[in-house]
Amino acid sequence: MSDRKNMKLFALNSNQEIAQKIAQAVGVPLGKLSSRQFSDGEIQVNIEESVRGYDVYIIQSTSFPVNNHLMELLIMVDACVRASAHSINVVLPYFGYARQDRIACPREPLTAKLVANMLVKAGVDRILTLDLHAVQVQGFFDIPVDNLFTVPLFAKHYCDKGLLGSDVVVVSPKNSGVKRARSLAEYLDAPIAIIDYPQDDATRNEGYIIGDVEGKKAILIDDILNTGRTFSEASKIVEREGATEIYAVSSHGLFVEGAAELLDNTNIKEILVTDSVATKEKTPKNVCYITASELIGDAIVRIHERKPVSPLFAYNKKK
């Protein structure tokens, strides 16, 4: 077993709360650093203890303000490189820019690949992240990437609440999220349904359901909850089609301005999200947070001890 004395964890400014929980799960205190922003917007990071020869883990979600948090991360990585860290591992509970993972129209940038290149060029040796928007983003990096899944966490939550079986239906509010919905449905032994829209429905007012939600408890699942519009529209559709109760779950709760008000005006009973993102905006009254810190902490320990991370990808239900 590798000695955790060779490991150091550092938290930047995006999500101090989850960083503290991750440190507790790993059993290693957070290292000392200072990070400040000058009046002109420049960021300065100072590591206040030696990292020479250590395996360094830097915890930072690149959430709002995305560019500040990304730049702070890059500066910290450079500081670790120049301070002779043995390895630099970046822990991204939420990876901003991952949605820009394809060229959808002419002359459009591939920004997820650009950010990957920046991190690798800065000196990152490994990425540990949580529920990438698209798993193929892993291929944008020329270094190892461990992409942890939140569905097992959600499955445990719903199983503990008794939300499983044929009385439940897992609904993907868009056709691109079918795989995610199917994964949760398999844990819950529940059917799935998909909300789709006609190709010419620019205002998204004519959504229809593929599958059956009538008389069932519907669980809407998406990876990123940003404005709340997707869940708001989907909740109206499943309610119209006869769902008896509506739940919503998302890996990353960004909750931009106005999202809480929009979601508070729906009949969604509970909105379940992880603590991957710390937001200063108002959150919905019925939001429920579950922590991903133990999952991430377990992954860090396994990486450091040269053990496989794959056992963390599943939740074993009690028979």
UniProtKB/Swiss-Prot annotation:
Residues engaged in binding D-ribose 5-phosphate: 222, 226-230
Catalysed reaction equations from the record: D-ribose 5-phosphate + ATP = 5-phospho-alpha-D-ribose 1-diphosphate + AMP + H(+)
Family annotation (SUPFAM superfamilies): PRTase-like
Gene3D superfamilies referenced in this protein's UniProt entry, alphabetically: 3.40.50.2020
A GO MF label: ribose phosphate diphosphokinase activity
NAD among keywords: no
Cofactor(s) annotated in UniProt: Mg(2+)
Entry binding sites for ATP: 40-42, 99-100
Regions that span the bilayer: none
Magnesium among keywords: yes
Binding site for Mg(2+): 133
Record note on cofactor: Binds 1 Mg(2+) ion per subunit.
Compartments it resides in: Cytoplasm
One GO term (biological process): purine nucleotide biosynthetic process
A Pfam family annotated for this UniProt entry: Pribosyltran_N
Pathway, per record: Metabolic intermediate biosynthesis; 5-phospho-alpha-D-ribose 1-diphosphate biosynthesis; 5-phospho-alpha-D-ribose 1-diphosphate from D-ribose 5-phosphate (route I): step 1/1
EC annotation from Swiss-Prot or TrEMBL: 2.7.6.1
GO cellular component, one term: cytoplasm
This protein's UniProt keywords: ATP-binding, Cytoplasm, Kinase, Magnesium, Metal-binding, Nucleotide biosynthesis, Nucleotide-binding, Transferase
The protein's role, per its UniProt record: Involved in the biosynthesis of the central metabolite phospho-alpha-D-ribosyl-1-pyrophosphate (PRPP) via the transfer of pyrophosphoryl group from ATP to 1-hydroxyl of ribose-5-phosphate (Rib-5-P).
Similarity field: Belongs to the ribose-phosphate pyrophosphokinase family. Class I subfamily.
Subunit structure: Homohexamer.
Protein name, as recorded: Putative ribose-phosphate pyrophosphokinase 2
Organism, as annotated: Streptococcus pneumoniae serotype 4 (strain ATCC BAA-334 / TIGR4)
